[in-house]
């Protein structure tokens, strides 16, 4: 049985629409958040080309992400490889604490901002209490990872090779992990394409939605 995992970054306003879409198909997902960048109300984040990207407000996070897995994406989304040790520790520990307090759930996962990491960053991620860390490195075999702090991905949600990589993972009965940012869904056609993918996967009798935490828990039990 193919396990399908999806991972979405940055806590932007389009996540509200995305979460509702996923609920309609009972699709599991992980959302990676930066608690230091959210304000009480929705706030401007940055410009992506001619598009303004806005972040969700703190007051709506619990409702938007109810039922989904939450992972840490650092406090303020810096390149962690450029930080001094004390700043690195703050980015990792303070963000995890804030997310756990707000969502009232353990935060086991991490996602490297900009995909940047090195041995010192990995060690700090582990020391801050995380059990896994997702990268943006594309790999053929996602799971089980050789190193849970260097968890690779299959592809982005918008990758032209999405279905060929899905089929390859399906043939092997492995794990297919796709990722992205919902602000990249800039048109009705892109939203329709994503929904078609979610619907197809949900209807596939040889596939099921999974979460990284659940997969790691199974692996830990088998290794015990």
Regions found by a protein language model. Give the residues of each.
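Aromatic/hydrophobic pocket-lining residues that form the small-molecule binding cavity
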Residues: 15, 88, 92, 162, ...
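A short acidic, amphipathic alpha-helical/loop segment
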Residues: 17-21, 120-124, 165, 193, ...
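Glycan-processing catalytic domains of CAZymes
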Residues: 6-7, 72, 132, 144, ...
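Metal-dependent polysaccharide deacetylase catalytic core of the NodB/CE4 family, i.e.
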Residues: 25-121, 126-131, 139, 144-150, ...
């Amino acid at each position: 049985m193919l396990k399908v995992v999806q991972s979405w970054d940055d806590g932007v306003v389009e996540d509200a629409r995305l979460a509702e879409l996923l609920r309609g198909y009972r699709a599991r997902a992980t959302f990676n958040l930066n608690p230091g960048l959210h304000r009480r109300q929705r706030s401007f984040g940055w410009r992506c080309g001619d598009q303004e990207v806005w972040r969700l407000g703190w007051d709506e996070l619990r409702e938007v992400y109810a039922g989904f897995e939450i992972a840490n994406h650092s406090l303020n989304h810096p390149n962690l490889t450029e930080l001094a040790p004390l700043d690195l520790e703050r980015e990792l520990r303070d963000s995890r604490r804030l997310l756990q307090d707000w969502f009232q759930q353990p935060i086991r996962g991490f996602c490297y901002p900009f995909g940047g990491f090195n041995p010192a960053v990995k060690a700090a991620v582990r020391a801050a209490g995380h059990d896994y860390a997702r990268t943006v490195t594309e790999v053929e075999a996602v799971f089980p990872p050789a190193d849970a702090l260097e968890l690779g991905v299959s592809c982005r949600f918008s990758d032209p090779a999405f279905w060929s990589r899905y089929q390859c993972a399906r043939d092997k009965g492995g794990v297919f992990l796709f990722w992205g940012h919902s602000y990249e869904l800039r048109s009705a056609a892109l939203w329709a394409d994503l929904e078609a993918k979610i619907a197809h996967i949900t209807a596939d009798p040889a596939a099921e939605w999974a979460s990284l935490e659940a997969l790691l828990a199974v692996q830990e039990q088998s290794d015990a």
